[in-house]
Amino acid sequence: MSSRFLLQLLGFWLLLSQPCRTRVSEEWMDGFIRMCGREYARELIKICGASVGRLALSQEEPALLARQATEVVPSFINKDAEPFDTTLKCLPNLSEELKAVLSEAQASLPELQHAPVLSDSVVSLEGFKKTLHDRLGEAEDGSPPGLKYLQSDTHSRKKRESGGLMSQQCCHVGCSRRSIAKLYC
């Protein structure tokens, strides 16, 4: 029994001593390649597969990932905000009895007591339309907002064009695997 245990321990130790094939050395990532067509596509898959592409990006851009992780998300609950009384402000024709019932009901709901309100703004349809119009960007060119967003999709277009330039460069001149990983992975 003890010899079998030692044999299993030896096998386990040998497995642990083998280098992990998903990790990539610096020399391999900085290696200069010159490939075209299918070979380029296969190399792209090999570079971006498993953890290879993530390794190339993680070594050069840890601050970018940290900045994305610490992005501030606005909270809807603000303990210093005024009580939630927009119903009473928007409906001036309510009787005093209904206003009293509404204020008592709102006071009994703790989740409504800390909701922020727009105290100085006048809620009107025209103001809402103007705000919506400005936010969608129709004020500049008069075109519908959907068309504007389709026309302003320059980030993905630039990425596609730079990808084509990278494949041509790798075919004619050559490029490093790290530059491919930065562009595609």
Swiss-Prot record:
Keywords: Cleavage on pair of basic residues, Disulfide bond, Hormone, Secreted, Signal
Residues of the signal peptide: 1-22
GO biological process: adenylate cyclase-modulating G protein-coupled receptor signaling pathway; developmental growth; mammary gland morphogenesis; nipple development; prostate gland growth; regulation of apoptotic process; regulation of nitric oxide mediated signal transduction; spermatogenesis
One Pfam family per UniProt: Insulin
InterPro entries reported for this sequence: Insulin-like, Insulin-like_sf, Relaxin, Repro_Hormone_Insulin-like
GO MF assignments: hormone activity; signaling receptor binding
CDD domains xref list: IlGF_relaxin_like (cd04365)
Source organism superkingdom: Eukaryota
Coiled-coil intervals, chain numbering: none
Prodomain residues: 58-156
Disulfide bonds: 36-171, 48-185, 170-175
Membrane-spanning parts: none
UniProt name for this protein: Prorelaxin 1
Species whose genome carries this gene: Mus musculus
Lineage, top ranks: Eukaryota, Metazoa, Chordata, Craniata, Vertebrata
Name of the encoding gene: Rln1
